[in-house]
């Protein structure tokens, strides 16, 4: 997904620069589908020798109308209107409708997980398909092993450069994709003249006829191959916030025409050569003159790399959103560029690299990868349709319109899903297993948070103000820090997590001039940055609610610096004069952040399922990042404390003092 978030005022505008940005960011996946989609369709029919005119016309017609109904109607005309403060994607859509039904978190988790799983296979199939074009260059192509090695080298380079950001090469994405789509359109138009009867495919009759025709050897399951042409449609919606609605509205017609011309050109070539026997045919490269193949392989490889980069960046964004929505554990996130939205997650990058490389080694050829492709993304689209239905209800769309749109989309996408199920035994089970693993982690993380919130005990801080005030003046204790800051996940007005007061008063009394209690609330809006302060009628207790959008960095110290300045300037917080400082006139004291981690106690009192969830979460936490880096505390003084998560009053265990017994025989002997 993209690297540039457009200003609100330009969201609905289209510009030439925005047009190029959209080409480079949004359409990589769907724009490289001509590399392999028609190849999969022909292979499913048993090869070029088994193709008839009606089959070719029907297949191209299915392609055209799939692009029209799924990409144009669902995503461009409907989904793009479901923006969350100009942001798109399945998690942005979920935040719009999650208050309507609690169970809507289920399609959000399933859709997000399958989209992530699909993101691991897309780079493998696109780059492999591009490199396989060398089969037509006999003096260069040696064998499939060479293709695999070349693909692995390209993918390794692509994943290795992620830590440096993509801003430098990203500027080339738009112009390269403009050349790519221009080539698709021009070459497709030229090849269409091989047999102009291919234009009949615009008529949907041929698409419907093919589904029920005895000439269609794959039958209904041909839809599994047809769906490959629109797998990138979900990315179009996900990148809404990075390019703007206006630029997508203007660029999609250009992209769609070029893609359709490419498929028509391939179809016309198939019509002109039907009945021939050609081994391992890929119509995309077969239509080219021999002296052009090497150049097109280079161009298609660049397009495949750009498509892969978009999927990788999109995976980073998707994971970061899931973390902020408490659907995934914390991972270390870096921001290698200066542009908003540009991020890098090492753990996700490594997982994608390993998984993508595994797919290349396991499937070996693009033909085998295609057989496993698209099942996961059909599930994502069905989940998006579910959430879209509730969005339309929320917006007050007429019921008849909702029924037509929802039933129509469920029928179409349900058909593609059913047709793709046959791919399960052809390798799609691996992608499904990856998606299930992600769903499992999401479920554990989300459910465990709810369980902990249920058991956490809260105390009224008003009842402890006198103790805190006495402690801050009690010179028998060393000054722990001028300002002590506690991050808490549960704070409701004057009620605060018991473990925090336990840490201040019981574990080791922490004398400070000011006690801060900070709670970060993730808002449904993507780029909110607001705060609310309650001094609790004191000048030494500060309750801070930080309201941050689900795409904002949660760097607490940087926000606190602004809040402290605001409070001191307004007179609500006394200035903390520093006698020793390299900063003349410094009025703010030192800070120590205390991160309290609660450890499960007396777990046997908990129901078995809840105990399993919390214990599983504890195991997952061992391999994930700590809150220190997530909250931007790595350059601050931090103390991490472990306190018990008490489910109920701990029952004292019975025990009796053992009294010394005097041996009777020994007692008699002494007398």
Swiss-Prot record:
It is found in: Cell membrane. Keywords: Cell membrane, Ion transport, Membrane, Potassium, Potassium transport, Symport, Transmembrane, Transmembrane helix, Transport. One of its GO terms (molecular function) is potassium ion transmembrane transporter activity. The chain crosses the membrane at residues 18-38, 60-80, 103-123, 146-166, 173-193, 218-238, 252-272, 292-312, 343-363, 373-393, 402-422, 424-444. Signal peptide: none annotated. It catalyses: K(+)(in) + H(+)(in) = K(+)(out) + H(+)(out). It comes from the Bacteria. Its main location: membrane. It is a multi-pass membrane protein. GO terms for cellular component: plasma membrane. It holds the Pfam family K_trans_C. InterPro entries: K+_transporter, K_trans_C, K_trans_N, Kup. Coiled coil: none annotated. Disulfide bonds: none annotated. Belongs to the HAK/KUP transporter (TC 2.A.72) family. Transport of potassium into the cell. Likely operates as a K(+):H(+) symporter. This is Probable potassium transport system protein Kup 2. It comes from Lactococcus lactis subsp. lactis (strain IL1403) (Streptococcus lactis). The lineage of its organism: Bacteria, Bacillati, Bacillota, Bacilli, Lactobacillales.
